[in-house]
UniProtKB/Swiss-Prot annotation:
GO terms for molecular function: argininosuccinate lyase activity. It comes from Bacillus licheniformis (strain ATCC 14580 / DSM 13 / JCM 2505 / CCUG 7422 / NBRC 12200 / NCIMB 9375 / NCTC 10341 / NRRL NRS-1264 / Gibson 46). This is Argininosuccinate lyase. The keyword Lyase applies. Coiled coil: none annotated. It is an enzyme of class 4 (lyase). It catalyses: 2-(N(omega)-L-arginino)succinate = fumarate + L-arginine. GO terms for cellular component: cytosol.
Amino acid sequence: MKKLWGGRFQKTPEKWVDEFGASIHFDKTLVKEDIAGSLAHASMLEKCGILTEAEAVKIKEGLTSLLHKAEKNELDFSVDCEDIHLNLEKMLIDEIGPLGGKLHTARSRNDQVATDMHLYLKGHTEHIIELITAFQHVLIEKAEEHVETILPGYTHLQRAQPISFAHHLLAYFWMLERDKERYHDSFKRINKSPLGCGALAGTTFPIDREYSADLLGFDSIYENSLDGVSDRDFILEFLSASSILMMHLSRFSEEIILWCSQEFKFIELDDTYATGSSMMPQKKNPDMAELIRGKTGRVYGDLIGLLTIMKGLPLAYNKDLQEDKEGMFDTVKTVEGSLEIFAGMIKTMTVNKNMMKKATEQDFSNATELADYLAKKGMPFREAHEVVGRLVFTCIEKGIYLSGLPFEEFKKASGLFEEDVYIVLDPHHAVEKRMSEGGTGFKKVTEAIQKAKQCLNNF
């Protein structure tokens, strides 16, 4: 088959070269974006007098016909045409005749593919922000149900201090809020048009880049044609924001996996988000959480892969950039799927309040309350820390917890202890009294929920 770029060549590539060099098996994902870019380009060419009105109408009718076929999955792509751009150009020529070849006037595949990817990430970045917001609503709803549900807070995966479960959930709310901020910021660079930059140096035709950018909904255009066709920072920023988001989801997944284990029993996942074992009939595995934790690694790989591709490329376009798309598509699919699944998983999970509370009563996570108790009575905190540490050791030797220690032992450790020490040791009391800004006190958590709601309302 004769290549659309084949005029300079005396030989056609061998079949294996076509197979190796073709990108149509993955960049066909950009079919709608490519047609949208072509429709805008045709309108711009007409406005600038490069196409007649009749020519532009016929070209746009042909493109619209291809778009309808694409929506019905009726387009038959060929490796012989290499990529989405040449496939659609050939289809347009087949549809309306040689006039279809005029569409590529004042345009290169270099600015064409860059435009496609900007359009693709524009839509998906907006969608991801919407999915994050939906997940945040789920977290708020669940937090409202569990303001006074108490569980151990952990450091080093060791029980540290009792906290409100709502407080724990809100920690992820604010992580997701930062993720949204990162996507919003990256969107500024995504929302720029490279269309009209040509192969690298612009064009001799009197085009109007601002006009085509406006038709496509871009806020601005690239100021430098070399930069416009070779820039992939906007993809790297998207992949970076996605990597951080997936890291947050992976951390949450790890906790979900722990919490629904027999060792914790803090939650139970809905059957929809778990699977069984082919051998062990009793198993209920948190597969969705495990998959999200695992897929985080592949998103990291997509980012590192593109960074590695870009690090040695001279200006402007190089064929290496054909490899910029699969990781982008993969990350979009992974992030969108992970957010949808996680929101449903949290919304439908059952919280075992009794097991959470029981965990705070069978540990030493109230030891800090005891040290604070002494410090408030005038003892230097470092000395109080030492006194309570010795009491914890005494309890370990006796096989009891601080709340079960006889009052005489407290008095022996320090004369500052009074009978009210047992109130201080109650986990509910310990959580309730943590009223510093951003703390886990019930009133502060209730206020924090309102702040989170206001944050979403402002969005």
